[in-house]
């Protein structure tokens, strides 16, 4: 469905090199990315600002021409076959609109039907399904400029799907949305993914979107893929530092040390302690605490995905710094 082989994109910029002199510098926005995404997959594509996410999406949709490497989407080459590709993909950018600002949603959808030459029966069936899942009926006849951000985003999703795309690219689809609107969008995308009819590629900084929707996670940093696998594999590789939180009847003895763990917090005059588990299992840590003090309550806190991804970014940049020094 989507194939990338050693895909790269560089940009030439001019940087100040003196009072009156500027020199050219080549920046690799995407650097040798190779990925294969199958039909019906829901893939999260994440990274810090400037990592190359949006540049990759623009190459996949035919907006940018790769500097080197190969890319195909739905068996088509995005740039030379951009018109044909547009009929087979849908794109939603959280900060850009494909709707007509002064027209009601219903009229925007009719125009898109004409643009994509969708048969009337297919158009109505898809629109009805989107209306049911996204609750559009209450604002179909309101001009887009008068819609709330959440309503407009639901309209954007519908507009991207009315021509029956095989691949849906989503760039920050929940940015700026309130809790209720986010939940509506996530529920809709989850239902869409369960059917397996559409391949979904999602880029976002809201990692809750990724955790709830995507089965596969690709992390990119400095233009290179640093992780490609399941969220569980990411946790296993970078999320081993669980925390043990214990409520005690009395403080731990002075100088207490838990081998393989670091005390990272103490509250309530020592009656609540937090340990970060490094090279000790939760079971062994619990046994040591129970031996040392009267324990009233215990909980093991798994690192959430934001902590795990932050650690991945930090480790990657530390490694890059060491490489540069060497």
Segments predicted by a language model, with ranges:
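Conserved ABC transporter NBD signature motif
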Residues: 69-77, 85-86
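Conserved ABC ATPase "signature" region
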Residues: 110, 114, 122-139
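Catalytic Walker B motif of ABC-type/P-loop ATPase nucleotide-binding domains
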Residues: 168-172
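ABC transporter nucleotide-binding domain
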Residues: 186-276
């Amino acid at each position: 469905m989507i194939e990338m082989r050693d895909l790269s994109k560089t940009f030439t910029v001019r940087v100040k090199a003196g009072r009156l002199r500027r020199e050219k510098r080549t920046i690799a926005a995407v650097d040798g990315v190779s990925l294969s995404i199958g039909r019906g997959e829901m893939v999260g594509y994440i990274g810090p600002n400037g990592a190359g996410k949006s540049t990759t999406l623009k190459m996949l949709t035919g907006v940018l021409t790769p500097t080197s490497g190969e890319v195909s989407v739905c068996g088509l080459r995005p740039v030379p076959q951009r018109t044909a590709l547009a009929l087979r993909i849908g794109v939603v950018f959280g900060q850009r609109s494909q709707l007509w600002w002064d027209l009601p949603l219903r009229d925007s959808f009719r125009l898109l039907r004409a643009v994509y030459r969708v048969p009337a029966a297919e158009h109505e069936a898809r629109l009805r399904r989107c209306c049911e899942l996204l609750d559009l009926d209450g604002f179909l006849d309101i001009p887009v400029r008068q819609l709330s951000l959440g309503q407009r985003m639901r309209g954007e999703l519908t507009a991207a799907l009315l021509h029956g795309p095989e691949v849906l690219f989503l760039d920050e689809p929940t940015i700026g949305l309130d809790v209720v609107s986010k939940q509506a969008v996530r529920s809709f995308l989850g239902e869409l993914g369960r059917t397996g009819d559409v391949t979904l590629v999602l880029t976002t900084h809201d990692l809750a979107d990724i955790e709830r929707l995507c089965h596969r996670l690709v992390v990119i940093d400095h233009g290179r893929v640093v992780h490609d696998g399941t969220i569980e594999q990411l946790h296993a590789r970078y999320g081993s530092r669980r925390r043990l939180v214990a409520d005690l009847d009395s403080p731990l003895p002075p100088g207490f040390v838990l081998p393989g763990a670091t005390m990272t917090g103490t509250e309530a005059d020592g009656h609540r302690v937090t340990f970060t588990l490094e090279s000790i299992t939760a079971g062994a840590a619990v046994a040591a605490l129970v031996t040392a003090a009267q324990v009233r309550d215990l909980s093991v806190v798994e690192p959430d995905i934001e902590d795990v991804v932050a650690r991945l970014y930090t480790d990657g940049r530390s490694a890059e710094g060491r490489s540069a020094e060497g």
